[in-house]
């Protein structure tokens, strides 16, 4: 297996322009495909998850032109749901942002589809979404394990009416249903059961739907009403924001070993909840400065925090490795959905933090981290999880090297992460 050893870094400083957001890129691609008119998407993320969505759209009859650097894409919208005459199998890798929304969208039109992916995708739950789609008349069957992909979908349209969705495992189930609801056969009301996790990701979905001309009435995240008679219309141009989760590594690095780092492509008006990571970093003692399209972080004396991170679970992973440089014991709470991500992130994070010398308590939905007096050089397993690789790069900000196994797993969202990290390192 390939590995990368990062030597101790004395100082982090400079400027980094973020790649496009994965969450925004795949949502916008799907809505551009369903919309009437041509949409020119700029700052699109070039990564595995986006490639899986683009490949699926090609098979579904969507025409698009991708620039040589793959960050600008002109999508010719269908102006309707997908209609295919031949059975199709769509392989979606480990891309939840493709699997969940496409599973819902393919119920809208006519066609016979199998949705599948990598072995890990077959361990990532989709039952709550399928249950909701079946309430609206969808014909979906599980081909292997109940509640998990692969799925077989017979497109027959989605009925109007009221459905309930369990929001406690993943917000992607609600996102998927919301994006398909305007093309259902009438008014749709979605009622949420349980605590809705990762609410800021729902805000991203609603914001992008609005840019494509669709209104959703949001009753305090407990009920969503999608009025009948709406359709998606291209906004013409669509700029994909920088990925706020990806910003977290550079902001944390500056907080630990700055200098100062300026991250461009996101700012105080970002639609992504993960920019709240900077607030958590500020609570730990970092100095943060906001602009319209940038965030600056500077070093501070870091102290432990005890916080609920249910709203920003992805960026919370970066707090776990930042905690190695903070005084005291840090607790990251209410992050059960780490367990159903690219890997079981609670178990993986606990295992790898212990390797570098931390004392760790792993609970069902929390992790408590006490740093050692000196970090240990360890080979970090990344579990084919891009965020594990990027989080543990921060260990090199100590006086100890760190070895990252399978560093190329960052290709899921940030293929040149380690190059960008090196450019800021002194």
From Swiss-Prot:
Gene3D superfamilies attached to this UniProt entry: Enolpyruvate transferase domain (3.65.10.10)
Pathway terms, separated by semicolons: Metabolic intermediate biosynthesis; chorismate biosynthesis; chorismate from D-erythrose 4-phosphate and phosphoenolpyruvate: step 6/7
InterPro entries associated with the record: Enolpyruvate_Tfrase_dom (IPR001986), Enolpyruvate_Tfrase_sf (IPR036968), EPSP_synthase (IPR006264), EPSP_synthase_CS (IPR023193), RNA3'P_cycl/enolpyr_Trfase_a/b (IPR013792)
Pfam families in the cross-refs: EPSP_synthase
Gene giving rise to this polypeptide: aroA
Keywords: Amino-acid biosynthesis, Aromatic amino acid biosynthesis, Cytoplasm, Transferase
EC number: 2.5.1.19
Taxonomic lineage: Bacteria, Pseudomonadati, Pseudomonadota, Gammaproteobacteria, Vibrionales
Protein name: 3-phosphoshikimate 1-carboxyvinyltransferase
Species of origin: Vibrio cholerae serotype O1 (strain ATCC 39315 / El Tor Inaba N16961)
């Amino acid at each position: 297996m390939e590995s990368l050893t990062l030597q101790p870094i004395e100082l982090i400083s400079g400027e980094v322009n973020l790649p496009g957001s994965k969450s925004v890129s795949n949502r916008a691609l799907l809505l551009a495909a369903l919309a009437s008119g041509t949409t020119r998407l700029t700052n699109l993320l070039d990564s595995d998850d986006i490639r899986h969505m683009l490949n699926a759209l090609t098979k579904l009859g969507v025409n698009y032109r991708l620039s040589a650097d793959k960050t600008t894409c002109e999508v010719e919208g269908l102006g309707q749901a997908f209609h295919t005459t031949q059975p199709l199998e769509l392989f979606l890798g480990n891309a939840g942002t493709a699997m969940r929304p496409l599973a819902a969208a393919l119920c809208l039109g006519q066609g016979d589809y199998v949705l599948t992916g990598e072995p890990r995708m077959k361990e990532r739950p989709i039952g709550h979404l399928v249950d909701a789609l079946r309430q609206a008349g969808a014909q979906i069957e599980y081909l292997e394990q109940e509640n998990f992909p692969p799925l077989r979908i017979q497109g027959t349209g989605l009925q109007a009416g009221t459905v309930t969705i369990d929001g406690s495992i993943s917000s992607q189930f609600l996102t998927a249903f919301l994006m398909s609801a305007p093309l259902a056969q009438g008014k749709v009301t979605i009622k949420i059961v349980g605590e809705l996790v990762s609410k800021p990701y729902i805000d991203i979905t609603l914001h992008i739907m609005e840019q494509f001309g669709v209104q959703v009435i949001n009753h305090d995240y407990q009920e969503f009403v999608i009025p009948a008679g709406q359709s998606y219309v291209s906004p013409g141009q669509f700029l994909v924001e920088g990925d706020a989760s990806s910003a977290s590594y550079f902001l944390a690095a500056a907080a630990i070993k700055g200098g100062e780092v300026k991250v461009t492509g996101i700012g105080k008006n970002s639609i992504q909840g993960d920019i709240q990571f900077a607030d958590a970093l500020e609570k730990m003692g970092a100095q943060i400065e906001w602009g319209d399209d940038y965030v600056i972080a500077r070093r501070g004396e870091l102290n432990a925090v005890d916080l609920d991170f249910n709203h920003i679970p992805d960026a919370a992973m970066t707090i776990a490795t930042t905690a190695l440089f903070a005084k005291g014991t840090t607790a990251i709470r209410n992050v059960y959905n780490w367990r159903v991500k690219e890997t079981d992130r609670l178990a993986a994070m606990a295992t790898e933090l212990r390797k570098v010398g931390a004392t760790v308590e792993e609970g069902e939905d929390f992790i408590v981290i006490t740093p050692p007096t000196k970090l240990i050089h360890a080979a970090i397993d990344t579990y084919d999880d891009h965020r594990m690789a990027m989080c543990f790069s921060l260990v090199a900000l100590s006086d100890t090297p760190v070895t990252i196994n399978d560093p190329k797993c960052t290709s899921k969202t940030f293929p040149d992460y380690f190059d960008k990290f090196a450019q800021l390192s002194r």
